[in-house]
Amino acid sequence: MDLKKFVLEGNPVCRKEAVIVGDHFRITMLTTALIRFEYSEDGGFEDRATQMVCNRDFPVPEFRVSDGGEELHIYTKDLEIHYDRQKFSPSGLMIRVAGGKASERVWHYGDEPKDLLGTARTLDEADGEILLSHGIMSRNGFSVLDDSHTMAMGEDGMVEPRQGNRADFYFFGYGHRYVECLQDFYRLCGKTPLLPRYTFGNWWSRYHKYTETEYKELVERFEKEEVPFSVAVVDMDWHLVEDVPPVYGSGWTGYTWNKKFFPNPPEFMDWLHKHGYKITLNVHPADGVRAYEEAYPRVAEKMGIDPASKEPVLFDMTDPKFIETYFEELHHPMEEEGVDFWWLDWQQGTVTKVPGLDPLWMLNHYHYLDSKWKGKRALTFSRYAGPGSHRYPVGFSGDTFITWESLKFQPYFTANASNIGFGWWSHDIGGHMFGYRDDELTARWVQLGVFSPMNRLHSTDNPFNGKEPWKYNQIVETVMKNFLKLRHKLVPYLYTMNRRASRAGLPLVQPMYYLEPEREETYEVPNNYYFGTEMMVSPITDKLDPVTGLASAKTWIPQGIWYDFFNGRAYKGGRKVDLWRDIYEMPVLVREGSIIPLKDMEGYDNSIENPEKLEVLVYPGESGEFVLWEDGGDTPEDLDENWVSTRMTKTADENGTVFIVEAAQGNTAVIPQKRSWKIRFCNIQDKPQEVTVNGQVYKDAEFAEDKKLHGTIVILKDVPADAQVKVTFAADAAVYQRDYAEEVYEILEKAQITYAQKTEVYKVVKELGTEAVPVLVSMNLNPSLLGVLMEILTMGI
C-alpha cells in the first residue's frame, strides 16, 4: 500500500508576497481578515500541512506595512495589527477589528476567546446541554484558531511531530461576516467532501443481537409497512463477542463474523444490497487483532509475528506497517464481501505512542481516505476529532440519553457545529439509552431527524427499546411513517444542498444569525436554523399542551413573507413568535418564491437513485429559482462532467404566474431520459391557462386540487428530460383566502375548555376577524390557547 494516498489535498505553502518575516516571527496575510501568526525561538517555521490546515495558497490580499522600528504596524481594510517583534505577549501583540464598538473589537494575545462556540467530540451520556469547544464566529468580530500543537503531515502520508516549542495560530477578524469567515475556513482547512447520495435516506440502527433471519424479516416488515431506509447499520454483535475465549479478554473489538448469527455474510450483504440498503458495520478497534480472529494468521505474518505464538497484534495507528496491514488484511477483504463503510466507534481516549496525537483523528483520516480504494465515493462514520474533522464525514455524535432534555439540546448542537465547519452530524435519533419511554418524545425526535443532516434511528441493547414505528401508539406510528417517507422524498433537495456544501462552503444547517447577524433576535433562538436555501426549521422540543393539544416552538421568522411547508399558511416575517403545532406537524417555513424538488413517492420505494417521478412545491412570491443538481451518486471524484442540472424558475407579475422547468443540461445519462412531474402550486386555486412542452401545448396534462397547500396540482407524464416544461396561470387566477374563523373553530373544537368559553371566543372572532385580538386578550383565556389564537390572527398577510 502506498501511504502517499493519505497526504492531504491542497498547497500548504503560502505566497511569498503575503509574508512579513523577522528573525523569530512570521506573519502571513492570507486575506484582509485572516492572518497567520508564528513565533519560533529557533527561527524555523512550518510550511507543511498540519492535521488542521492543508492549504495556505491564498491570493495575496491588499495590506500596508508601517515599520516603526521596534514596532510593526500592519493595516488591511478589516484589521489593524500592532506587534513589538518579540515573543507574543498581551502587551506586544494587539489587533483591532474594523466596525462595531472599539472596546469590543480589540484583541490582545492570550485573551480568552468569546466566540459563539463550535461543537464537541461526542454526546456520549449527554442528558441535555454539554460544554462545546471554540468556533470561529464571534459577536465581537474575531476569533483565534490555535494550530500550535497539531502534528505535521509528512510527504510519505504519515504524521510527524513538529519541531520546537513554536506558536502557530490563525486570527479570524471578519466582524459579523459569518458566511465569508466560514468559507475562508474551508479554503484554509479543506472543503467538506461530497457525500454519497444514499446517506441522505433513512438509516436503520439498533444495538441488538440480530440474526441474519431476524434482520431479513425486519427489512421485509419495513417493506410491507412502506417504511423506507437506505442504510443498514449493524452494531457490534455482527462479530464474535460472548464466544471469545476468556484468555483473550473481552469481545469489544472483533473482526470475525459470528456465524451463529450470520452463517453466510456475503450472501446476507448481497441480499441487503438487492433490497436497496448500503451496509455499515460497527467496529471498536482498540484491542487490535488477537489469535482467535480468522484474520489473525495473515495479520500476524504481515506484522512479522509468528502466528503460533498467539501474540496479539496491538492497535497502533502510528506504525505505517500496522496501518497497511489493518486495511489490507482486515477491512478490504470484508469490503470485498459487501461492507460499504465503517462505523468507527472509538471510545478509548486520546493517547497514542506519539505524545499529542489523537488516535481518533488518525482513524478518521486514514479510514476516510482509504475508503476510496474500490473506486467509490469516500465515507466514514465516526466521532469529531477537532477542527478539520469536516474533511472526514459523517460524524457520529455518540450515546445520548432518551430524555426531553437531550432532544432540546440537539437542534442547537447541530446548527452550532457549522461555526467550526462541521456540517454532517448523525445523531442517535430517538436517543440511545437510559431515560424513559415517551411516544410523543420519539415522534418529535424523528421529526427533528428528518430535518437534520442525517436521519439515523438508533437504540441500545434493551428488549423494550426499539425505534420500529409499529412499537408505538397508532398516532405516533403514523407520524413516524409519514416523516420517514418525507425524508426519502427530500433526497433531491438534500443532494443539491450536498453539492452546495462541498462547492460553495455553505452547510445544509446554519444558525439564524448567519444571514441576519445584526438582529438580536437571531441569537435568541438557538434551536432555529436554516435548512438549505429554501427552508428554516424550528423543531418542537416540548410536550403537547393539555388544553390545546398543541406544542409550541419559539421562532424567529426572518424578514419577508414565509409559508408553512406543510399547509401553505402565510406568515409576515421580521418578528419572534411562538408557533403551535399538533403531533402530526412541526414548524418548517419556506421563504416566498421557494421552489422545492421532491421525489414523488407512491407506495413503498426506498430507492435513492435519481427519480423518474418528481414532485415540485412552488410557493407564492414574485420570483423564485432552484437548480436541481444530480450525478451518479457514488462517483469517487466530484468532477463537473459528472453533473446534470435542471433549472426551475417562477415569476409572478401583472401578466400572471409562469413556472418553467428548463431542459436538463450536462451529463443527462445519469438521469431518467423521461420524467413525470407533479407540480404543486401553493395557494393558486384555478387551473393553468396553458401548459406547454417545448413550446407545444401539452394536452395530456392532469389537474387536481391540492387540499394540503390550498392550491392546484399539475401533472405531466413521460416528459423528455431535455424538454422545457412551462405552466402559465392567468393574472386573475383565484388565490386562496384564509378563513380565520374556520381556523379558530378547528382549534376551539379540540380545546379542553368549557363549552361556554368556546362559544364566546368563536363569536368574537366571527364578528371581528383579525380585529378580535384586544377582546381576546381581555377574556382571561388559558395562556396556551391565547398563544395559538395570536398565531392565527396576527401573523398572516
Walk through the language-model features, giving the residues of each.
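Catalytic-domain carbohydrate-binding cleft regions of carbohydrate-active enzymes
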Residues: D2-K4, N11, I81, L93-E585, ...
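Solvent-exposed beta-strand/loop surfaces of large extracellular or lumenal domains
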Residues: R48-E62, I305, Y563-I583, E690-I715
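Accessory, solvent-exposed terminal regions and/or long lumenal/extracellular loops of proteins
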Residues: G593-Q696, V719-A721, T728-I797
